[in-house]
């Protein structure tokens, strides 16, 4: 176990904060022992992957655990490959591992930063694909009982950018994830930016190259401008809301969902509040993609970025009467903060 306290290089917003202690966990046993110690000493802790979906508002007065449990184990039958993957594997490393071994299926999720465990918590998705579509099971440590248990996909309560692990952040620690990748590959090209590709001749590698180009074209490099990608979720609303908005904004993009509801684009709403490039202190709305808030010169505090997010939120409410929900987790001195405490309007 390695120990340190500085968190700036451990969160992609590059917010300069500290924790009481940072411990790297490489195996299940270490995690279990640390859990027991924390329970006995009445300590609290935060499990972190790459820090690519958190915003630290202030110094964290607890222990940060970096989950680095590794391992990619593959079995197969005639219809699918089955992957048993450590929560501490880098997500993009896993994607490229499967592509190099001719196991296509994860290519639309290429270049999403973070680790496998955090990807499950967030139910990451991009370009028409969500991780939950491939999830078979999740092996977790029950932090209430100290037992290792297996939750199957239907028990994980996956929704758009949600899961049981996000709703019960301090109940489970993810150890391993089980994925199923079907051998009968069907490319997903329905998302804007991919529709021009030829369904009959496209290869997984071509999809990856296209998505890499699209992502680097519109998303900032967190090494230069700290960010977490999309700060807000795309709002899902009833069609009557869209019908009302169409009377005033005939060009508003919207997408019907399987349950009959309609998804709007948060980036479009923010951009149409004329907020692209808006600067507040050391934080700003990225000039190429309004859904991304950035630490402009790597000097912003967490509260500055949160203030910018609140400003954006209020502008969207005032103009469209739509209340955006953050994708990012807000972390205060003693743990996660309910975003409703910040976004009150």
Curated annotation (Swiss-Prot):
Catalysed reactions listed for this entry: UDP-N-acetyl-alpha-D-muramate + NADP(+) = UDP-N-acetyl-3-O-(1-carboxyvinyl)-alpha-D-glucosamine + NADPH + H(+)
Pathway(s) this gene product operates in, as recorded in its UniProt entry: Cell wall biogenesis; peptidoglycan biosynthesis
InterPro entries: FAD-bd_PCMH, FAD-bd_PCMH-like_sf, FAD-bd_PCMH_sub1, FAD-bd_PCMH_sub2, MurB, MurB_C, MurB_C_sf, Oxid_FAD_bind_N
Active site as annotated: 161, 230, 327
Stretches assigned to coiled coil: none
GO cellular component: cytosol
GO biological process: cell division; cell wall organization; peptidoglycan biosynthetic process; regulation of cell shape
Pfam families membership: FAD_binding_4 (PF01565), MurB_C (PF02873)
Location of the FAD-binding PCMH-type domain: 15-218
UniProt-listed Enzyme Commission number(s): 1.3.1.98
The keyword Cell division appears for this protein: yes
Cofactor dependence: FAD
Top-level taxon: Bacteria
UniProt-recorded Gene Ontology molecular function terms: FAD binding; UDP-N-acetylmuramate dehydrogenase activity
Subcellular location(s) per record: Cytoplasm
Keywords attached to this entry: Cell cycle, Cell division, Cell shape, Cell wall biogenesis/degradation, Cytoplasm, FAD, Flavoprotein, NADP, Oxidoreductase, Peptidoglycan synthesis
Alphabetical list of HAMAP family matching this protein: MurB
Family statement: Belongs to the MurB family.
NCBIfam families in UniProt: murB, PRK00046.1
Function according to Swiss-Prot or TrEMBL: Cell wall formation.
Protein name: UDP-N-acetylenolpyruvoylglucosamine reductase
Source organism of the structure: Blochmanniella floridana
């Amino acid at each position: 176990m390695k120990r340190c306290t500085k968190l700036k290089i451990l969160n992609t917003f590059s917010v300069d904060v500290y924790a009481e202690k940072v411990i790297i966990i490489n195996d299940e046993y270490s995690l279990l022992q640390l859990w027991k110690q924390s329970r006995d000493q009445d300590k609290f802790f935060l499990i972190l992957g790459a820090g690519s979906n958190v915003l630290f508002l202030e110094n964290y007065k607890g222990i940060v655990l970096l989950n680095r449990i590794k391992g990619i184990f593959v079995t197969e039958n005639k219809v699918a490959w089955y992957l048993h993957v450590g929560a501490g594997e880098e997500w993009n490393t896993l994607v490229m591992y499967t592509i190099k071994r001719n196991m296509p299926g994860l290519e639309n999720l290429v270049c999403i930063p973070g680790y496998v465990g955090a990807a499950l918590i967030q139910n990451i998705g991009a370009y028409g694909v969500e991780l939950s579509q491939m999830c078979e099971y999740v092996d977790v440590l029950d932090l209430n009982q100290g037992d290792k248990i297996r939750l199957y996909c239907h028990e994980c309560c996956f929704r758009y950018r949600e899961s049981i692990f996000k709703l019960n952040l301090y109940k489970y620690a993810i150890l391993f994830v089980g994925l199923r990748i079907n051998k009968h590959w069907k490319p997903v090209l329905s998302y804007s930016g991919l529709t021009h590709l030829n369904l009959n001749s496209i290869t997984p590698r071509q999809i990856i190259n296209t998505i890499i180009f699209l992502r680097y074209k519109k998303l900032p490099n967190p090494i230069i401008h700290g960010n977490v990608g999309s700060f807000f979720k795309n709002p899902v609303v009833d069609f009557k809301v869209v019908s009302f908005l169409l009377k005033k904004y005939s060009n508003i993009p919207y997408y019907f969902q399987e349950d009959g509801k309609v998804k709007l684009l948060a980036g479009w709403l923010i951009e149409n509040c004329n907020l692209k490039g808006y600067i507040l202190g050391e934080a700003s709305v990225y000039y190429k993609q309004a859904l991304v808030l950035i630490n402009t010169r790597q000097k912003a505090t967490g509260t500055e970025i949160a203030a910018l997010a609140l400003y954006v939120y209020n502008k969207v409410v005032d103009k469209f009467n739509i209340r955006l929900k953050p994708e990012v987790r807000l972390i205060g001195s003693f743990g996660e903060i309910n975003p409703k405490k910040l976004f009150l309007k």
